């Protein structure tokens, strides 16, 4: 009679332990999963109003910021990761890396909710060896790499880092706005 409660308690403990280890996900592809039972789908640019504001760098060596504000006009959606930003010049396209040490936090946007991210750059000289003559920037949202938005770049050339190839620019993670 005593062994039944001990056996039952052990079985119950094992079941609870195994259940606690399962997150209900499917593994590495969880961030791409758009199954409604696993939460909102990835946000798409086609459902966003896009506004751009800049604190342009006035002279070579100065730091400037370009803030992109997104307002969700569609159904609730989620941003998991960083925006992918490219700087476009006549002869090349350069990827902008996330800020050093930055960690992306998942952000869920309801209809009408707003978020923003910032491209920070160092204005370069009018010298192709030291700067990239950017004419546009393009960005996509995580989970929607084919849905790009391009904006005109009127903030001058972007400095190259000392390695001569990498641009001196970074992109922030998504910041929540409003309530």
Pin down the residues of each PLM region:
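Bacterial signal peptide processing site
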Residues: 22-25
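Short, well-ordered beta-strand segments enriched in hydrophobic/aromatic residues
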Residues: 64-72
């Amino acid at each position: 009679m005593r062994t039944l409660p001990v056996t039952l308690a052990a079985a119950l403990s094992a079941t609870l332990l195994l259940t606690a280890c399962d997150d209900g996900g499917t593994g590495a592809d969880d961030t791409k999963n758009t199954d409604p039972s696993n939460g909102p789908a990835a946000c798409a640019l086609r459902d966003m109003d896009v506004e751009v504001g800049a604190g342009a760098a006035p002279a070579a060596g100065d730091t400037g910021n370009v803030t992109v504000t997104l307002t969700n006009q569609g159904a609730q959606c989620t941003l998991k990761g960083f925006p992918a930003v490219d700087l476009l010049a006549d002869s090349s396209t350069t990827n902008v890396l996330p800020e050093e040490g930055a960690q992306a936090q998942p952000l869920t946007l309801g209809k009408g909710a707003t978020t923003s991210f910032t491209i920070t750059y160092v204005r370069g000289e009018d010298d192709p060896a030291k700067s990239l003559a950017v004419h546009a920037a393009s960005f996509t949202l995580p989970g929607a790499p084919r849905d790009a938005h391009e904006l005109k770049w009127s903030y001058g050339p972007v400095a190259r880092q000392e390695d001569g190839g990498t641009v001196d620019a970074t992109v922030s993670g998504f910041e929540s706005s409003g309530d």
